[in-house]
């Protein structure tokens, strides 16, 4: 994996690019002067860290004079050295700054700052392997471009959580589903004290064609929602599945979804059966 130097104009998306690399497992250092690039290489190499990304921009302008010798030395030591430079037109940068209300690192009027910044960073742009114009890119699109550029796998996990509505829906769920229309094992005395993890309870929940149809449509909806979340750049998506008490139906549905979605292309895990009690009725 490469040693990546990320640079570019303020507001062009450097933070998004760094965050994308960090989420992909890179060791990240922001605002590192060129004079310290080689020291960083020594540090991470000594600790066996292979995936490294650093950013350098006009916040370290006092040190940019050391750019060329630092780059030449590092490029001789790292055959996998990559330089990514981000830019955008002045109007878009101005709009982004107006939204963020941040002060430009050069501290002058913004349009003057942008012109001066381009001048200061011209040497970095000149050594860049890749220049990305983010004028027409959203943060999610830029993240996808960075993932593609470095051939990174986008880590995504679908998390399932069963619960009982009488205990309140989970606050951290991205999507809450109601499965109370499924057959309720609570009304079968032989099943009441069991949980939806047990085969005879699950068989009761999915006992007829209507229940199977309901489950099939629910699974398709969950899978579609997860795929769209992954495509948008999300790294996780939490689905809460609720019945009345959180003991039977929601547990059975969550367990079945877990088994079937794990066999698909979506990494799926069970967070918790929040309100289930093994060997007893739900509280």
From Swiss-Prot:
GTP binds at residues 57-60. GO terms for molecular function: ATP binding; GTP binding; molecular adaptor activity. Transmembrane segments: none annotated. InterPro entries: P-loop_NTPase, RapZ-like, RapZ-like_N, RapZ_C. Keywords: ATP-binding, GTP-binding, Nucleotide-binding. Signal peptide: none annotated. Pfam families: PapZ_C, RapZ-like_N. ATP binds at residues 8-15. Belongs to the RapZ-like family. Displays ATPase and GTPase activities. This is Nucleotide-binding protein DR_1434. It comes from Deinococcus radiodurans (strain ATCC 13939 / DSM 20539 / JCM 16871 / CCUG 27074 / LMG 4051 / NBRC 15346 / NCIMB 9279 / VKM B-1422 / R1).
């Amino acid at each position: 994996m490469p040693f990546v130097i990320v640079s570019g104009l303020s507001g062009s998306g450097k933070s998004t690019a760094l965050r994308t690399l960090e989420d992909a497992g890179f060791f990240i250092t922001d605002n590192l002067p060129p004079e310290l690039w080689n020291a960083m290489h020594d540090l991470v190499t000594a600790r066996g860290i292979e995936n490294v990304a650093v950013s350098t921009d006009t916040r370290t302008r006092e040190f940019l004079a050391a750019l060329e010798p630092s780059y030449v030395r590092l490029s001789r030591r790292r055959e996998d050295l990559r330089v990514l430079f981000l830019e955008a037109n002045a109007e878009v940068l101005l709009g982004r700054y107006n939204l963020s209300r941040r002060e430009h690192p050069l501290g002058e009027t913004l349009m003057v700052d942008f012109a001066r910044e381009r001048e200061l960073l011209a040497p970095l742009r000149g050594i860049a392997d890749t220049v990305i114009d983010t004028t027409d890119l959203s943060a999610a699109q830029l993240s996808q471009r960075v993932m593609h550029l470095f051939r990174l796998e986008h880590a995504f996990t679908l998390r399932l959580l069963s619960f009982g509505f009488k205990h309140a829906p989970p606050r951290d769920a991205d999507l809450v589903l109601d499965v109370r229309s499924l057959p309720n094992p609570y009304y079968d005395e032989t099943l009441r004290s069991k949980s939806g993890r047990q085969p005879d309870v699950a068989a009761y929940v999915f006992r007829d064609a209507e229940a199977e149809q309901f489950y099939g449509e629910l699974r398709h909806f969950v899978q579609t929602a997860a795929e769209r979340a992954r495509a948008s750049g999300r790294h996780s998506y939490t689905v809460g599945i609720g019945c009345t008490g959180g003991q039977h139906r929601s547990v059975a549905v969550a367990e079945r979804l877990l088994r079937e979605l794990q066999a698909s292309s979506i990494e799926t895990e069970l967070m918790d059966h929040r309100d289930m009690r093994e060997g007893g009725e739900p509280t």
